[in-house]
Amino acid sequence: MSITPERKQEMIKDYATKEGDTGSPEVQVAILTERITNLTEHFKIHKKDNHSRRGLLMMVSQRRRLLDYLKGKNVKRYEDLIGRLGIRK
């Protein structure tokens, strides 16, 4: 259900804008998307896990805020990111 440290480092390397970049919106959104995907799979089995569902909703909200921020700062980076992650149509 959680992301392994190796997977997290791989995602940081893939989405970082420069060396050592772990806090850029792109990296944060990519990690949140992975966590959201994992939790979505969890809920297919555990439908009544409302405690974790609240955490999922908080993650989705955080990702939305980060995407809104990125869209306001740099639309090109926003469009590239959603294209790479496949989270918008």
Curated annotation (Swiss-Prot):
Keyword 4Fe-4S: no
SUPFAM superfamilies in the record: S15/NS1 RNA-binding domain
Cited PROSITE patterns: RIBOSOMAL_S15 (PS00362)
Disordered: annotated span: 1-23
InterPro entries hit by this protein: Ribosomal_uS15 (IPR000589), Ribosomal_uS15_bac-type (IPR005290), uS15_NS1_RNA-bd_sf (IPR009068)
GO biological process, one term: translation
Family: Belongs to the universal ribosomal protein uS15 family.
Subunit structure: Part of the 30S ribosomal subunit. Forms a bridge to the 50S subunit in the 70S ribosome, contacting the 23S rRNA.
Name of the protein in question: Small ribosomal subunit protein uS15
Annotated organism of origin: Rhodospirillum rubrum (strain ATCC 11170 / ATH 1.1.1 / DSM 467 / LMG 4362 / NCIMB 8255 / S1)
